[in-house]
């Protein structure tokens, strides 16, 4: 199974991350409020102190956060996920609902750093996230879609 970093374990992210654990993936989670990672750690996830630490060695990095500013905080900067040494050609998957301008900037920045980018906002509610029943609105390069 894949090694996955999951950034943002709030209302939606916790359920999504839980489904990945149940599917057998090796999951490392990060949340700015560490307490929110505890239930996932009890299910077998590893909790990380920074997005960079979570993303280290990952095949894919998934984010599910509240807004553009939270997204920028987990992806960019010295401890952001894009500063991590991940698996070669790692996927970045942004599931948050974000502005068009920021999504374009993030995709370009990820590409410049050697990551493949998938834009994947979701629709649904937390109870549906917990059982893997969300609608995904996926945008990606064709080859990246096939790989994902």
Language-model features, listed with the residues they occupy:
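NAD(P)+-binding Rossmann beta1-loop-alpha1 motif at the extreme N-terminus of oxidoreductases
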Residues: 1-63, 90, 126
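Rossmann-fold dinucleotide-binding core
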Residues: 4, 98-148
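Active-site-adjacent beta-strand anchor residues
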Residues: 30, 64, 96, 138-139
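Rossmann-fold NAD(P) dinucleotide-binding segment
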Residues: 51-116
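Residues in the short beta-alpha loop(s) of Rossmann-like NAD(P)-binding domains
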Residues: 33, 67, 141
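Structural detector of well-ordered beta-strand residues that form the stable sheet scaffold
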Residues: 28, 48, 92-93, 118, ...
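Acidic, glycine-centered active-site loop in nucleotide-sugar glycosyltransferases
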Residues: 42-44, 77-78, 89, 130-134
């Amino acid at each position: 199974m894949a090694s996955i970093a999951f950034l943002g374990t709030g209302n939606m992210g916790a359920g999504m991350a839980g489904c990945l654990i149940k599917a057998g993936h090796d999951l490392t989670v990060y949340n700015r409020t560490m307490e929110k990672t505890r239930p996932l750690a009890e299910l077998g996830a590893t909790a990380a102190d920074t997005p960079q630490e979570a993303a280290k060695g990952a095949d894919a990095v998934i984010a599910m956060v509240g807004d553009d500013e939270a997204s920028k905080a987990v992806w960019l900067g010295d401890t952001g996920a894009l500063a991590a040494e991940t698996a070669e050609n790692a996927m970045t998957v942004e599931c948050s609902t974000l502005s068009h301008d920021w999504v374009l900037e993030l995709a370009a920045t990820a590409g410049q750093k050697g990551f493949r980018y998938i834009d994947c906002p979701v629709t649904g509610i937390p109870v549906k996230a917990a059982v893997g029943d969300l609608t995904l609105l996926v945008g990606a390069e064709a080859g990246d879609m096939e790989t994902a």
